[in-house]
């Protein structure tokens, strides 16, 4: 009889303990649970169900900070000259705006250089909303559409920063030229020193890159039309396996089709592939793009169901896609979803802008490479607090396969690598505009 009160107490303690364990092990409330179709070939939980430990968010000093008043007098006018594909030009624009504020200059609308390689002829105003950009940059930096009459007839003094080696300092190297010529143009250097940026210059860069750049109304209309045509929910996949991409990587792929091998050889020029131990070292460093077949294996290792709707955010000329679409059958592309006449008329920048819009708004984003588009998309998704973003690890894939792992053992090892990456947000390489928060 003495033991009768103890039993209810024991049951209560046991029940409470189990409830506490369930709460602690439940997925973080910050994680967006995407109702992707069931049917994973490797398990019941996909990568998006992994509980995150760290999270990137826009830094408070930028979003909530007080603007430093602009000086009464400008040191001159700066035009940022942007080259390459759309996302490379956008990267240069972001850097250039921060530099212009650093040098207390007035910003002239950037010049998007015609690039024959990208089949492109559109300028900044053809892709981005100029008035929106000027409005959002108000208080951060003065932006003008037209130069004063005494300067408008002159060509800017061109300052070549892009290929400078070593740490490049704009205050020491460019400010004297701006004061001398009053109107200069430049392409930002990759090796610039940001440690000398005051907070107001960094805030200007962040504002320009993540708050002020908006597609033109006509282009946004096309992007919304494309987005609406994709079955929901969906994953946006940035897959890079074009002939020029493979040729540039200098990697060897022995099991490709004859047509793919011929296309790669035609694009190689003097970029011969590495051989022997150098080839293995290069691959283990993560320098070789994933093939579509390797991408399939990677997605399956992450328990991404083969019935998932996938939007292929990619350029023209992808090779070896049969191996991918035979497994993941719900694949959608711009060329299929858009009006064929409109699609045929589109230039490279327009297509890249559409991929960008879809990718920053998709339920999930996966990249097989880590190029300019991936960096911009990852940052914008973070800005929008959309955290289902992942970069497939080429380095881990090469290292694990070199150890002889295959089948279920390889998939399990790849899962562990990417589970860790997703949990702590590793690999995003986000710029100074974002800060890490412990969850």
From Swiss-Prot:
GO terms for cellular component: membrane. Its main location: membrane. It is found in: Membrane. GO terms for molecular function: glycosyltransferase activity. Glycans are attached at residues 104, 119, 293. The chain crosses the membrane at residues 8-28. Keywords: Carbohydrate metabolism, Fucose metabolism, Glycoprotein, Glycosyltransferase, Membrane, Signal-anchor, Transferase, Transmembrane, Transmembrane helix. Substrate binds at residues 238-240. Pathway: Glycan metabolism. The keyword Membrane applies. Its EC number is 2.4.1.-. InterPro entries: FucosylTrfase_pln, GDP-Fuc_O-FucTrfase. CDD domains: O-FucT_plant. The keyword Transferase applies. It is an enzyme of class 2 (transferase). GO terms for biological process: fucose metabolic process. It is a single-pass type II membrane protein. PANTHER family: O-FUCOSYLTRANSFERASE 13, OS02G0726500 PROTEIN-RELATED. Belongs to the glycosyltransferase GT106 family. This is O-fucosyltransferase 13. It comes from Arabidopsis thaliana (Mouse-ear cress).
């Amino acid at each position: 009889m003495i033991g009768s009160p103890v039993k209810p107490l024991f049951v209560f303690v046991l029940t409470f303990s189990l409830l506490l364990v369930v709460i602690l092990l439940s997925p973080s409330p910050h994680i967006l649970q995407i109702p992707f179709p069931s049917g994973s070939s490797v398990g019941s939980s996909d990568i998006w169900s992994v509980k995150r430990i760290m999270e990137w968010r826009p830094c408070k000093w930028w979003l909530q900070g007080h603007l430093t008043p602009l000086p009464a007098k400008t040191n001159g006018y700066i035009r940022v000259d942007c080259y390459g594909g759309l996302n490379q030009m956008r990267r240069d624009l972001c850097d250039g705006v921060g530099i212009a504020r650093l040098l207390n200059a007035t910003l002239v609308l950037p010049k998007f250089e015609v690039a024959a390689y990208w089949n492109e002829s559109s300028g900044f105003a053809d892709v981005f909303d100029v008035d929106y950009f000027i409005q959002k940059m108000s208080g951060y930096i003065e932006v003008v559409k037209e130069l004063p009459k005494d300067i408008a007839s002159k060509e800017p003094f061109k300052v070549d920063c892009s290929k400078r080696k070593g740490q490049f300092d704009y205050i020491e190297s460019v400010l004297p030229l701006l004061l001398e010529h009053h109107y200069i143009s430049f392409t930002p250097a990759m090796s610039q020193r940001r440690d000398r940026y005051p907070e107001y210059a960094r805030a200007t860069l962040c504002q320009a890159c993540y708050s002020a750049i908006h597609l033109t109304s006509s282009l946004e209309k096309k992007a919304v039309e494309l987005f609406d045509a994709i079955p929901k929910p969906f994953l946006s996949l940035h897959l890079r396996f074009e002939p020029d991409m493979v040729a540039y990587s200098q990697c060897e792929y022995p099991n490709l089709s004859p047509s793919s091998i011929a296309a790669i050889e035609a694009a190689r020029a003097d970029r011969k592939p590495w051989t022997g131990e150098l080839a293995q070292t290069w691959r283990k460093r993560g320098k070789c793009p994933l093939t579509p077949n390797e991408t399939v294996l990677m997605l399956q290792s992450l328990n991404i169901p083969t019935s998932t709707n996938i939007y292929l955010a990619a350029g023209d000329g992808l090779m070896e896609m049969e191996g991918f679409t035979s497994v993941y059958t719900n694949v959608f592309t711009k060329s299929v979803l858009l009006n064929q006449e409109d699609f045929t008329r589109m230039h490279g920048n327009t297509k890249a802008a559409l991929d960008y819009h879809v990718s920053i708004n998709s339920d999930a984003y996966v990249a097989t490479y880590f190029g300019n588009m991936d960096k911009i998309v990852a940052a914008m998704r973070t800005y929008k607090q959309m955290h289902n973003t992942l970069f497939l690890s080429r380095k881990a894939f090469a290292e694990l396969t070199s150890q002889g792992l295959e089948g279920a053992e390889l998939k399990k090892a790849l899962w562990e690598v990417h589970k860790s990456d997703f949990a702590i947000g590793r690999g995003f390489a986000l710029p100074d505009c974002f800060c890490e928060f412990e969850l």
